[in-house]
Amino acid sequence: MEKNQKCATEQERFKARSGHGDGQRAEPRKTQTTTESDKDSGYSDVASECLSSVEQTDTEEGPTTSRWNVALKPSGKTPSQPQSLVVLKNLLVDQGSGPEPNASSWAVHPSIQLLQTSPQIVFFPPTVSSSKPSTCRKDTKYLPILKSYTKIAPHPSHRVSNISLPCARKRGPDERPHNQTKRQCSKGHSGSRKGMDAATLLDTGVQQGPVDQNVKESSVSAKNKELDMQLTTQNINSNEKGSRVASLDTQQNLLSAGQQNKSQRFQNTLDILHRSGLLSIAMKTKELARHNQATQSQLEKLQEQVQLYATAMSSNNPHDWQRLQDSLAEVVKGDTEDLSVREMDL
């Protein structure tokens, strides 16, 4: 009975620690154990009863420890939480070598023995973080797309109804330098752009310059080659013409030299013939030969006339007489010509 009372007291302590829900669940088991303890008085029943109570405490310690572990997790919402509590019990585990062969099958051999020591309770203070919990403030007017770019004009939602439109006012003396600086900046930007354009144009011109020079040099060299070819052809033609003229001159010179030689020879022969008297003899022989030819032609004509006369006499044909007259007329003409030639010679 004392052992049963000890088990009951331990169960009550554990129920007080574990909470209201667990206590309510354990109440019917308590009544059952008390009624069974009143009925049974054996040692084995008491041992089994203690074993069941210990098993019940073990099963109930599982969810409670898990609950306390969940409670130990830090949360930023409620800083006021109960302190963590851990209960330590001295349990001795008895591992038997094996069931005895002679033991009855219904006997229960306890495997856990309780020591006669009071349980120890350890309190762990909750760890409080020194850093303050960061609170995220939600901006109802947060627009990431609009705020990621530079603002040109305010968003309609950010405008205030009390803000009035700016009135048209005159420009003061303070605003003129600002406008002038803006103009100067714009002029400077335009000048820099123009300078950049000019620089790019100069770069392109410098890059295109050697190409143009190479093209020009190639064209000039081609033109020079053509001019050289033309000059060479002209020189060849002039040389050919000069050679032809020189050959003609040489021929003329040769002809003139030959004629001069002939004339000199003739003059030399004339001088020699005139000095020797042979020239007059040659002239007379030449004239005599010419007279001889003339007399020979006259003799031939005279023979023809004699024959014509003989035929005309024999035939008394007027045609023959006509032929005779024609031949005589020719002889007369020839004689007159000879006379005129002689007179001219004289």
UniProtKB/Swiss-Prot annotation:
<keyword id="KW-0539">Nucleus</keyword>
<feature type="compositionally biased region" description="Basic residues">
    <location>
        <begin position="179"/>
        <end position="192"/>
    </location>
</feature>
<dbReference type="GO" id="GO:0042754">
    <property type="term" value="P:negative regulation of circadian rhythm"/>
</dbReference>
<dbReference type="GO" id="GO:0005829">
    <property type="term" value="C:cytosol"/>
</dbReference>
<feature type="region of interest" description="Disordered">
    <location>
        <begin position="167"/>
        <end position="228"/>
    </location>
</feature>
<dbReference type="GO" id="GO:0045892">
    <property type="term" value="P:negative regulation of DNA-templated transcription"/>
</dbReference>
<comment type="function">
    <text>Transcriptional repressor which acts as a negative-feedback regulator of CLOCK-BMAL1 transcriptional activity in the circadian-clock mechanism. The physiological relevance of these observations is unsure.</text>
</comment>
<feature type="compositionally biased region" description="Polar residues">
    <location>
        <begin position="50"/>
        <end position="68"/>
    </location>
</feature>
<dbReference type="InterPro" id="IPR031602">
    <property type="entry name" value="CIPC"/>
</dbReference>
<keyword id="KW-0963">Cytoplasm</keyword>
<feature type="region of interest" description="Disordered">
    <location>
        <begin position="1"/>
        <end position="83"/>
    </location>
</feature>
<feature type="compositionally biased region" description="Polar residues">
    <location>
        <begin position="205"/>
        <end position="222"/>
    </location>
</feature>
<protein>
    <recommendedName>
        <fullName>CLOCK-interacting pacemaker</fullName>
    </recommendedName>
</protein>
<dbReference type="GO" id="GO:0005634">
    <property type="term" value="C:nucleus"/>
</dbReference>
<dbReference type="Pfam" id="PF15800">
    <property type="entry name" value="CiPC"/>
</dbReference>
<keyword id="KW-0678">Repressor</keyword>
<keyword id="KW-0090">Biological rhythms</keyword>
<dbReference type="GO" id="GO:0048511">
    <property type="term" value="P:rhythmic process"/>
</dbReference>
<feature type="coiled-coil region">
    <location>
        <begin position="283"/>
        <end position="315"/>
    </location>
</feature>
<feature type="compositionally biased region" description="Basic and acidic residues">
    <location>
        <begin position="1"/>
        <end position="42"/>
    </location>
</feature>
<keyword id="KW-0175">Coiled coil</keyword>
<keyword id="KW-0804">Transcription</keyword>
<keyword id="KW-0805">Transcription regulation</keyword>
